[in-house]
C-alpha cells in the first residue's frame, strides 16, 4: 500500500476555482459524503464574508451560495447520509440547507438559548445529534445539543435544544468534534485550554465527562485518531500540538503521547519555514497520523506524527500565494482540496498533469473579520526567537 507521504508528494493541481465577485478568505472545506450516479460531487466552503459556497468538485465552479445574514457563519459540515449542509451562526442558530437546491432559506433551523453566539459545531456520525459551542457570555460557555432528525409527525423547520452542558468550559468553545463511528462520543476544545471528552449517552454532564486534557492554550483544532479512534490530537492558536491516548485512561500508562508547546521551534524544516499549523490527517488504512502546516507564502507541509515527535516529510508548492487556511483530503481518490487567504480553491490529484495559472496575492481583510477567524500570530514566536 502506498504511504500517504508518497501520495501527498505525487499531488499536482488539476483545477483552480474561478474568481468570484467578492473574493474572500476560504476558512473551511467539506465534501459531500454521498455519491449519486449522474450527479456532481459537491464541495462546501466557508468564506470569511459569512457565507457558504457550494462548488462542483470536478469543475470548481460555484453552484450556489448560502448566507447567515445578519449573523456570521462558523464551520461547515455535510451530513453523512444526504446532501444537507450545516453551519453554526453568531445569531444563535445552527442552520441547515439542501446543498442541491438554490434556496436562500434554511430547510432546518436549530435555535439556541437567549444570548447564545455559536462559533463551533458538529453533527454525529448517524446524523441524529448536533452539538454547538458558544462564545462566553457573562459566565456561560455552553455546549448545546439538538435532535437533528426530521419527524414525520412534526413538520416544523425550527427546533429547540435538547439541553446543554454548562459546567465544563470557562471560555469560548472553539472546537466540537464527534467520534467518527461512535455517535455518543464527542470532544470539545476551548480558549480555556481544556479538551473535554463526553459520552452523551449518560444523562448528566458531570457523569458524561469521560476525561479532561489540558493544552494550556487556546484550542484551534481537535480530531480523533488511532485504531478505533481512541486517540485525540489538538492544535492551539499559538501553534502547539498535543496528542492523547484514551486507551490509557484506566491504566498506569501515560495518557499523553506527545506534547509540543510550539511546533515551529522543534520541527526541522531544513531550508524551509513553518509559519502555522492547519490541521491533522489520520489515515485509517495505514494507522498513521499526519499534521499539515504551511508558510505565509502558500507552501503546504506534511509532517509525520509519532511519540518521538513531528517529522517534516514533503511539501506542496506552486499553488497558493498566501496563508492556507483549510484543506480536505478524500480517501476514495487520494485527492486534496485546499483554500486560503488568496481566495483560491485548488483541487490536487495524484500523478496529474500540473495545471499552470496566475497566483493571486493575499487580500486585505477587515479587522472585525480578522478577529472572528482567529488569525494565527507570529508575534510570540518572533519574540522568543530574539531572546
Swiss-Prot record:
Keywords on this record? Repeat, WD repeat
Concerning InterPro entries, the annotation shows: WD40/YVTN_repeat-like_dom_sf, WD40_repeat_dom_sf, WD40_rpt, WDR89
Which SUPFAM superfamilies would you find in this protein's record? Answer: WD40 repeat-like
Q: Which PROSITE patterns match?
A: WD_REPEATS_2 (PS50082), WD_REPEATS_REGION (PS50294)
What GO biological process term is on the record, naming one? corpus callosum development
> Where are this protein's WD repeats?
21-65, 68-107, 112-156, 168-208, 214-254, 319-358
Q: Which Gene3D superfamilies match?
A: YVTN repeat-like/Quinoprotein amine dehydrogenase
PANTHER family found in the cross-reference section: WD REPEAT-CONTAINING PROTEIN 89 (PTHR22889:SF0)
User: What is the official name of this protein in its record?
Assistant: WD repeat-containing protein 89
> What lineage, starting at the top, does this entry show?
Eukaryota, Metazoa, Chordata, Craniata, Vertebrata
